[in-house]
Design a protein with these regions (language model features):
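Phosphate- and other anionic-substrate recognition elements at nucleic-acid/protein interfaces
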Residues: 1-176
Length: 176
């Protein structure tokens, strides 16, 4: 999300039909039913899989890259957690799993030298991981607000990042 001070901020929502990630170098990775695009300059790619039905689409994922391993490892675990779950039970399971994922990912972020984004587990699990949280954390770290983001028109969303989960999908931003 920003190159300032060499810090990489990553946020993406990977679902059954769409998922996006931005990483250091301003290159986009596309997940879900899309292929991975231009994964050659990955510094770190950290995220979580929201879709428990499809999991990680190995046959559609495109070229592998070592930095993708931490994302890939969550899919089977998350998918198993959803077996037999419907309605509110499934939602609760989703939140529980996302909280566990968040803790593992926070540790991975720190190992990569990336600070915590300061989002509580409840907010993470509820899909409220939004741009305002990211920008607030950047400001606390003394990093200027990125200037290359804007809300895109609907036809441009194929080149966008979704910051947030299924409950925050309207917060879509595009790299200029």
């Amino acid at each position: 999300m920003t190159k300032n001070n060499g810090i990489t901020i990553i946020a993406f929502d990977a679902g059954r039909t769409t998922g996006w990630a931005l990483y250091h170098g301003e290159t986009l990775l596309r997940f879900g039913q899309f292929t991975v695009a231009d994964a050659t300059d990955v510094t770190a790619c950290i995220g979580y899989i929201l879709d428990g039905r499809d999991g990680w689409p190995r046959d559609k994922a495109g070229p592998r890259h070592p930095a993708l391993a931490i994302v890939e490892e969550h899919a089977p675990w998350y998918q198993r957690s959803h077996e037999g779950q419907v309605g509110e039970n499934r939602i609760k399971t989703s939140m529980d799993v996302n909280i566990k994922c968040r803790r593992r990912l926070e540790a991975a972020l720190l190992r990569c030298g990336i600070p915590s984004l300061g989002v509580t587990p409840a907010e993470w699990g509820a899909g409220r991981y939004v741009l305002a949280d990211v920008l607030a954390e950047l400001a606390r770290a003394g990093i200027a607000e990125p200037e290359n983001f804007r809300i895109p028109a609907r036809e441009h969303q194929r080149d966008a990042i979704v910051l947030g989960g299924k409950m925050a999908r309207r917060r879509v931003w595009e790299v200029r």
